[in-house]
């Protein structure tokens, strides 16, 4: 938003601050000023001159010799502008003047004729060409004849050349600051000054707008309010000089008085207006409706636009005359021949305007304000202000009242309760009631008091204020952030560090990487096919509902995941398709669980560890061969992890969908299920185009509960250990892990560790049988074990296992 400092002075007294000081104060209060630029440097030697005579140069066809009065003297100036003529008032740079670009004006001779200055164009005075009206862009600038311009006076005074323009970076939550009055309210509050609002004195003729035009809103959801004003017998001509100056300073090119007035009021009130040539309207009806598929309108930029049902259009009952809130149509535009003006002031919903802007690529000052939101209580005010200016500067006759259709609550204001105790508690200050009253009065907010609580009636122009915290921000920014007391932190200052949970995550991550697995980071989003696939058994799928996104990036990223494994499988699939075969991945990430089909509460988030392995595995010294990943490799990784964490993990065979029926186990700590591991079912592997693949997933939240981050001390064994190997012939239905656990129980306390080192099925064994070899480690912490003690325990274990599982020892 470009804000003219001189224009702003019409509403607020700025005598006490320079433009730079004002910019600093506004920025400090919360609206950033990105820069302050002056239109041109102040120059005492550029004055208004009157061309007394204009004659052809005796020795140059394209030059003229003029005698120009500049008040106290008359200067002879040679001028080459094609539009120079006797009787004009022009801008004269006298000798000694310095124009933009460091152009120094001196007395010179041009083709033998002395020239004592320069008659200037607006560009030469420092104005940007893109903002200069097209009718005066070429040649020198000539002051309008109907302006009472004093010869010899400073040009700065008439062309606003010394004006400073503040470039405001207005955030999306402050659309009120996209108008001069909105900025004036802000500045008045910051400087603690009164604000002077425009007056609207209008002499009406004895005709009513409601007798001339009828309004019918068909799309009330997109256009809840529409008002029409009418001004007759206008004279199209250039705008007054002061208005053109303000528009150019604000970055808008002046066109003619009617169009300029609508733009001026747009900038002043923040309310977009549109002027129609009523005589070209071809109807006394205004119908606001959705566009018809294939319908065409030619807009003011002379482009034909094809409409859809998503476009909101203004029509005369039969054909579109404007794209609502974006741009008018060429079939009803104001021209030099316009006599009667129909003026639109409306409230268009942001969604309707935004869609048309995206479709057409047309973005304007009007559409920007509709997209960000306008003040419903300024709609009629802005319309009346435009009628007043058209009466004064276009000689128009204003009809009484206005036609409207209203489905908008334009009067309601929000009430926000502001308890003084909470204000002081939040700010850490001791503000008094008078302090808060002062801030509210400076903001021009009406309020009541109930004891020490302020009931603030927030004006509709401040759409950003809805709750107590919003008012708290207003209080401190107007009272001044520099008044906040400096408070030294009290109590012990604890140095930063990782939490126990973060430390455990780090330990798990370090172990997995040292085991040879690579860490991945996948999307937390998945598709409908995978969202309930391979979920840990401790999640109740019957009562858990996948959480879907309202606006997903794609169908592959529509649901929050319940399991990490499916995304790891997709990574395996991606890499195998690129000829990578030995893949070992793990990930620590969150899964999301909801017990509600319609989400009304925050879902439960759990941290999980997952892994996926295929191909060859190698985490041994470099000289050893790699081995094929199998069930026991993955089981060994998990056992190693929990040994590292000093937690006892047990495995129990389980059947899970998408997992191999004989090679899947659930993981338990102290009888509590925390996850699963095993081989992917061949059918599931085929879905992902994978070879034999093993996966696991562990609920780390359960692990955190069991984990105690205090190292336990165990004496170094003083006496040697003894190992014995034993191979049992078991039925294939018997779980090797169950036998392992049973041996541990029977052999206690002498048997310290039992491990499986070989499994065999095939030749030399009966059908339905398997050979499982176990290694038993014996140790007594108090003495050296004797052979007979070990042998006795060994035989006891053999007899117990054979009896329980129907096995026999392999010879």
From Swiss-Prot:
Residues reported in the UniProt entry to bind Mg(2+): 464, 470, 473-474
Tell me any Pfam family this protein matches: tRNA_bind
Give the source's domain of life in one word: Bacteria
Q: Which organism is it from?
A: Oceanobacillus iheyensis (strain DSM 14371 / CIP 107618 / JCM 11309 / KCTC 3954 / HTE831)
Q: Which gene encodes it?
A: pheT
Q: Where is the tRNA-binding domain?
A: 40-156
PANTHER family for the chain = PHENYLALANINE--TRNA LIGASE BETA SUBUNIT, PHENYLALANYL-TRNA SYNTHETASE BETA CHAIN AND LEUCINE-RICH REPEAT-CONTAINING PROTEIN 47
Per UniProt, residues of the FDX-ACB domain are 717-810
Q: Does the keyword Ligase apply?
A: yes
Tell whether Protein biosynthesis is among the UniProt keywords. yes
Q: Which UniProt keywords apply?
A: Aminoacyl-tRNA synthetase, ATP-binding, Cytoplasm, Ligase, Magnesium, Metal-binding, Nucleotide-binding, Protein biosynthesis, RNA-binding, tRNA-binding
Q: Show the InterPro entries listed in the entry.
A: aa-tRNA-synth_II/BPL/LPL, B3/B4_tRNA-bd, DNA-bd_dom_put_sf, Fdx_antiC-bd, Fdx_antiC-bd_sf, NA-bd_OB-fold, Phe-tRNA-ligase_IIc_bsu, Phe-tRNA-ligase_IIc_bsu_bact
Q: In which family does this protein belong, per the annotation?
A: Belongs to the phenylalanyl-tRNA synthetase beta subunit family. Type 1 subfamily.
| Coiled-coil segments | none
UniProt-listed Enzyme Commission number(s): 6.1.1.20
**Per the UniProt entry, what are the Gene Ontology biological process annotations, in alphabetical order?**
phenylalanyl-tRNA aminoacylation
* Subcellular localization, as worded in the UniProt entry: Cytoplasm
Q: How is the cofactor bound?
A: Binds 2 magnesium ions per tetramer.
Which coenzymes or cofactors are required?
A: Mg(2+)
Its chief place of residence is: cytoplasm
Full protein name:
Phenylalanine--tRNA ligase beta subunit
Q: Which reaction does it catalyse?
A: tRNA(Phe) + L-phenylalanine + ATP = L-phenylalanyl-tRNA(Phe) + AMP + diphosphate + H(+)
Q: Describe the protein's quaternary organization and the partners it interacts with.
A: Tetramer of two alpha and two beta subunits.
GO CC annotation? phenylalanine-tRNA ligase complex
